[in-house]
């Protein structure tokens, strides 16, 4: 990554031109989004687009709201009482905040990979087949093909093709995370959410996940939350900087990291806080 240096000091407070929506069609459109934990407003008037077949990175200090925003995209907050979202989150023109929405179908369309690998306590084969069976009834031969395709898509097939009956828990940490990615894409989502997917992995495993993300964007729209700013710079086309529940700056990744409009973005990127 190119060394980042700044020759000017930016003014404090909101900066004009700090929110630049990506070019091209939007897969997800967020408008006037607010989110509440009880009476506490955790997200404040968020407006942004996730470009189709691109990687959008969310950065910011702990507690800034980036993971909260990510989990709104597949309504994970519905699992917890007292949490609610207001505004619009449009997926291909349909508001996913609609209370009548089928959440199982939404979570098939919007998959998620978590910080810690979470393989099911079952075989590698069944880790992949389990999700497919929730939505489809297919023959054994069709299932075999789908499992292989998902494992290839997760860059894991060549490492496990001779031990599909082994437990998913027997794999290394990096392999387990790729298994979780394969499990996610097996149900044919349109959007994949990554919440700190490499924070528990070694550098070699991290590099494999980053290479995989670059390949996956050919078929999927991707959003990734990361504390690793170098990772955000490597894998994404657009970057959003969040602070205290607000979207401070959003635009092309190169610009965010080399010439941000807002002083808070500059201070975070240069390590002055966070």
Curated annotation (Swiss-Prot):
Enzyme nomenclature, EC number: 7.3.2.1
CDD domains reported in the protein's UniProt record: ABC_PstB_phosphate_transporter
Molecular-function GO terms, alphabetical: ATP binding; ATP hydrolysis activity; ATPase-coupled phosphate ion transmembrane transporter activity
Key words, A-Z: ATP-binding, Cell inner membrane, Cell membrane, Membrane, Nucleotide-binding, Phosphate transport, Translocase, Transport
This protein's GO CC annotations: plasma membrane
Paired cysteines (S-S): none
Catalysed reactions, as listed in the record: phosphate(out) + ATP + H2O = ADP + 2 phosphate(in) + H(+)
Membrane topology: Peripheral membrane protein
Ligand binding (ATP): 60-67
Protein name: Phosphate import ATP-binding protein PstB
Keyword Nucleotide-binding: yes
NCBIfam families the record matches: 3a0107s01c2
């Amino acid at each position: 990554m190119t060394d980042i240096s700044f020759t000017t000091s930016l003014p404090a407070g909101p900066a004009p031109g700090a929110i630049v929506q990506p070019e091209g069609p939007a897969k997800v459109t967020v408008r006037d989004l607010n989110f509440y934990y009880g009476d506490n407003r955790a997200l404040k008037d968020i407006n942004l687009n996730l470009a189709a077949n691109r990687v959008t990175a969310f950065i910011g200090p702990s507690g800034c709201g980036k993971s909260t925003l990510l989990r709104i995209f597949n309504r994970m907050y519905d699992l917890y009482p007292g949490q609610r979202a207001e505004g619009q989150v449009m997926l291909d023109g349909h508001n996913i905040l609609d209370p009548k929405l089928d959440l199982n179908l939404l979570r098939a369309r919007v998959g998620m990979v978590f910080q810690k690998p979470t393989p099911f306590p079952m075989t590698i084969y069944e880790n992949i087949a389990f999700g497919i069976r929730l939505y489809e009834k297919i023959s054994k031969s069709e299932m075999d093909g789908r499992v292989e395709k998902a494992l290839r898509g997760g860059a894991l097939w060549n490492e496990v093709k001779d031990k599909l009956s082994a437990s998913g828990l027997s794999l290394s940490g990096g392999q387990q995370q790729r298994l979780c990615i394969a499990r996610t894409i097996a149900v044919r989502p349109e959007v994949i959410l990554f919440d700190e997917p490499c924070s528990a992995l070694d550098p070699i495993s991290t590099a494999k996940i980053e290479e995989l993300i670059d390949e996956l964007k050919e078929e999927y729209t991707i959003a990734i939350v990361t504390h690793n700013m170098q990772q955000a710079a490597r894998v994404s086309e657009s970057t959003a900087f969040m602070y205290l529940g607000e979207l401070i700056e959003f635009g092309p990744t190169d610009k965010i990291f080399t010439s941000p409009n807002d002083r808070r973005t500059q201070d975070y990127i240069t390590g002055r806080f966070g």
